Amino acid sequence: MADTLAIVVAAGRSSRMGEGPKKQYRLLAGRPVLGRTLEVFEHAPAVDGVVLVVAPGEEDWCREEIVTRFGFTKVVAVVPGGEVRRDSVWAGLQALPPCALVLVHDGVRPFVTARQIAAVAEAARECGAATLAVPPKDTVKLGGPPGAPVSTLPRENLWLVQTPQAFRFDVLIKAHHLARERGLAATDDTSLAEAAGYDVRMVPGAYTNIKITTPEDLAFAEALLGGGPVLVGFGYDVHRLVDDRKLILGGVEVPHDRGLLGHSDADVLVHAVMDALLGAAGAGDIGRWFPDDDPTYRGISSMDLLVRVAAFLRERGLETSNLDAVVVAEAPRLSPFISRMRDNLASVLGVSPAAVNVKATTTEGLGFTGSGAGIAAYAVAALRRIVLPGDRVL
């Protein structure tokens, strides 16, 4: 039985966002908001799996364009939601495998951190129900229509509730059963737990854990992600063409009478890309990371090495903003394979293929590439720092 599973709810109609795509599918620094939210859960050690709840009819699109495209392996199911939030969470509960704890999270809160997820889960393990929350900074007044008398609420007793909210599985099931029997509606799941007689523990959240609901929220989120300079790196690599070797470029086996000589699979394109990424991060080069005299890397797929570089970038709070690469080869003709190379690179780096460009050219018979002695590759990578509130200062 899994220990902790999450229900990520993204079935809203997005009426307050205005015209255009729904809020969960709007691009935030080049990636869908929902994709950024799922990214946090994908790399949160406290979470074993995720059930994604979307609007009816959007399941296949989300599986293909978000879950599969960005490689979210923890998503165990994508299910249709209901008319109101309570029904959507209930749909997610029905799709959950057996587990001890359940987290419920808004799909449009991409700035929650792995540390906060772990804290709220541990609190629910101890007391049954917990939520992230922050005290209000502003004075809060209670009143009716404009012009009606108002009263000021004591701020020290108030909390602004966020997600994720965490529950022991039996607690959340009972709360939803009672809510359905009584016809209770609520804007969050802790309200249902309270109505069922359970106490809910407040766990300190962060003011940056915003729910993106309006265009103003989206602009604020862009500012959170976009702070700091763009980091640029350049990569170059070359390998000799020899007999009795496969030709691997961008993780694609390209039919040819010769292949590239190297300690690994000699994927010259991926090597140039890794050098560009490491250069942008100020982290040396592939010779330092993967020495050619280390037997560990003999014959290894360069795509596997790129996976390690991508993981390092995430640990450093960096993500790829844009990648442009060119392969220089007189032969073979590479255009039929370019799109697969691009998709392979984008998948490992966790970005949209639109952020990756791969092209091929020749040197018109000049030099070692023109004579067919070898193949070269150049790459330029741009990285951005991701702000991770509460986990680290970047």
Curated annotation (Swiss-Prot):
Keywords: Isoprene biosynthesis, Lyase, Metal-binding, Multifunctional enzyme, Nucleotidyltransferase, Transferase. The keyword Nucleus does not apply. It catalyses: 2-C-methyl-D-erythritol 4-phosphate + CTP + H(+) = 4-CDP-2-C-methyl-D-erythritol + diphosphate; 4-CDP-2-C-methyl-D-erythritol 2-phosphate = 2-C-methyl-D-erythritol 2,4-cyclic diphosphate + CMP. Its EC number is 2.7.7.60, 4.6.1.12. PROSITE patterns: ISPD, ISPF. InterPro entries: IspD, IspD/F, IspD/TarI, ISPD_synthase_CS, MECDP_synthase, MECDP_synthase_CS, MECDP_synthase_sf, Nucleotide-diphossugar_trans. GO terms for biological process: isopentenyl diphosphate biosynthetic process, methylerythritol 4-phosphate pathway; terpenoid biosynthetic process. Signal peptide: none annotated. Residues 1-230 are annotated as: 2-C-methyl-D-erythritol 4-phosphate cytidylyltransferase. A divalent metal cation binds at D237, H239, H271. Its cofactor is a divalent metal cation. Pathway: Isoprenoid biosynthesis; isopentenyl diphosphate biosynthesis via DXP pathway; isopentenyl diphosphate from 1-deoxy-D-xylulose 5-phosphate: step 2/6; Isoprenoid biosynthesis; isopentenyl diphosphate biosynthesis via DXP pathway; isopentenyl diphosphate from 1-deoxy-D-xylulose 5-phosphate: step 4/6. 4-CDP-2-C-methyl-D-erythritol 2-phosphate binds at residues 237-239, 263-264, 285-287, 290-294, 361-364, 368. In the N-terminal section; belongs to the IspD/TarI cytidylyltransferase family. IspD subfamily. In the C-terminal section; belongs to the IspF family. Bifunctional enzyme that catalyzes the formation of 4-diphosphocytidyl-2-C-methyl-D-erythritol from CTP and 2-C-methyl-D-erythritol 4-phosphate (MEP) (IspD), and catalyzes the conversion of 4-diphosphocytidyl-2-C-methyl-D-erythritol 2-phosphate (CDP-ME2P) to 2-C-methyl-D-erythritol 2,4-cyclodiphosphate (ME-CPP) with a corresponding release of cytidine 5-monophosphate (CMP) (IspF). This is Bifunctional enzyme IspD/IspF. The gene is ispDF.
